[in-house]
C-alpha cells in the first residue's frame, strides 16, 4: 500500500519521465537508421558519369593547384613506334628544332613486351634527348592506338600544367610558330580544333574495321587524327571519365564519339591537311599529314630559305568547309578555292 501511495503521489513526474525516455529512444533509432541507409546506399550506375561530369565542372570553376612535373602553354604529343628512330630524328631537326621554351614536345611509345634490345635503344635515345613518353603498361601496336591515346592523355592531365595539346603522328609536319600565334587568341577551354569529317562510313574490313560500332550508320563528327588540338579541360574530361569510355579501332573516331555529347567548340579548319592522304602543299597549311622524311626536310629547308612552306604549291585533292547547319552525312562538299 505504501508503494501504491508513492506511485500515485508522483504519477505526474513518472509520466513525464517515461515520455522523455521514449522520445530519446526514438531519436537514437532514427539516427542509427539514417546512418545505416547512408552507408548502404549506392548511386545507380547510370548516374555515375553525371556525378563525375558535375565534379569536373566544379573543379574547372575552382581548379586545384597541385604541383606538376612540367608546365607549358602548348604540349605536342607525337604517337610513334619503338623502331621509328629516324622519323623522330627528322622531326627533332625540322619542325621541332626552334620551338619556344613554353612548348613541350614528347614522342609517345608503348614498351610492354618489347625485346630487351629495343628497350635498351629507347633508353639510350631517352638519355640523349629526354623527350620520350614511355608507357610500360601498353603494348605498342596499331590495334592499341586508342588505348595509347587514353594512356597519354591521362599522363598529360596528371603531370603537366598546360593550356593546349597538339596530337600528331610521326609522319606529320606542323607549323608550331603559327599555331602558337593563333592559340594566343583562343579561349583555353572547350576547344576541339582540326579538320572534321561527318560523313565517314563505318569500315567493315581492313585495319580500320570496326566490329562493335553501333551508334550510327556513319561515324560521329570527328577531327582527323593526323593532327588536331584540344584544350586542357577536354583532356581532363577524358582522363576522369576513362573508366566509362568505350574504345573503337580508330583513335580519332573514338575521340569524336567521346566528345559527341559534350558542349565543345568544334572548329573545322582546312589549313589542317590531316586526311588519310595529303591534299598537296599549300603555304597556308598549319599541319600536314602523310609526309615522308624527304617531304619534311624539303618543307623545313624551304621555310628556312624562303620563309614559306612549299617549294611550289600543289593541289592533289579538293578540300571543303564543314557545313554545321546540315546533317553530318551532308557536311562536306569538296570545292575549289579552299586550301
Task: Indicate residue ranges for each PLM-predicted region.
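Secretory-pathway lumenal glyco-enzymes, predominantly type II signal-anchor Golgi glycosyltransferases
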Residues: 1-339
Amino acid at each position: 500500500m505504501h508503494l501504491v501511495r508513492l506511485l500515485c503521489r508522483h504519477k505526474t513526474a513518472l509520466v513525464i519521465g517515461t515520455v522523455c525516455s521514449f522520445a530519446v529512444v526514438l531519436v537514437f533509432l532514427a539516427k542509427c537508421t539514417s546512418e545505416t541507409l547512408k552507408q548502404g546506399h549506392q548511386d545507380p550506375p547510370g548516374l555515375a558519369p553525371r556525378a563525375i561530369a558535375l565534379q569536373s565542372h566544379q573543379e574547372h570553376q575552382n581548379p586545384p593547384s597541385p604541383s606538376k612535373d612540367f608546365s607549358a602553354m602548348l604540349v605536342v604529343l607525337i604517337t610513334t613506334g619503338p623502331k621509328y628512330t629516324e622519323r623522330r630524328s627528322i622531326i627533332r631537326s625540322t619542325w621541332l628544332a626552334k620551338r619556344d621554351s613554353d612548348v613541350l614536345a614528347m614522342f609517345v611509345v608503348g614498351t610492354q613486351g618489347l625485346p630487351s634490345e629495343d628497350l635498351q635503344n629507347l633508353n639510350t635515345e631517352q638519355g640523349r634527348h629526354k623527350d620520350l613518353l614511355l608507357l610500360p603498361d601498353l603494348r605498342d601496336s596499331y590495334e592499341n592506338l586508342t588505348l595509347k591515346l587514353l594512356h597519354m592523355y591521362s599522363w598529360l592531365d596528371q603531370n603537366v600544367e598546360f593550356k593546349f595539346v597538339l596530337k600528331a603522328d610521326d609522319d606529320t609536319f606542323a607549323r608550331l610558330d603559327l599555331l602558337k600565334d593563333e592559340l594566343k587568341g583562343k579561349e583555353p577551354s572547350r576547344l576541339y580544333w582540326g579538320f572534321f569529317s561527318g560523313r565517314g562510313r563505318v569500315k567493315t574490313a581492313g585495319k580500320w574495321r570496326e566490329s562493335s560500332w553501333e551508334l550510327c550508320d556513319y561515324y560521329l563528327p570527328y577531327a582527323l587524327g593526323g593532327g588536331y588540338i584540344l584544350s586542357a579541360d577536354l583532356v581532363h574530361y577524358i582522363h576522369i571519365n576513362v573508366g566509362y569510355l568505350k574504345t573503337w579501332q580508330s583513335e580519332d573516331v573514338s575521340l569524336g564519339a567521346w566528345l559527341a555529347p559534350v558542349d565543345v567548340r568544334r572548329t573545322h579548319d582546312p589549313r589542317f591537311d590531316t586526311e588519310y592522304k595529303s591534299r598537296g602543299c599549300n603555304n597556308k597549311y598549319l599541319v600536314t599529314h602523310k609526309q615522308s622524311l624527304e617531304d619534311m626536310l624539303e618543307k623545313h629547308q624551304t621555310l628556312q630559305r624562303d620563309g614559306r612552306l612549299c617549294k611550289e604549291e600543289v593541289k592533289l585533292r579538293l578540300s571543303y568547309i564543314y557545313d554545321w547547319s546540315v546533317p553530318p552525312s551532308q557536311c562536306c562538299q569538296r570545292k575549289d578555292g579552299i586550301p
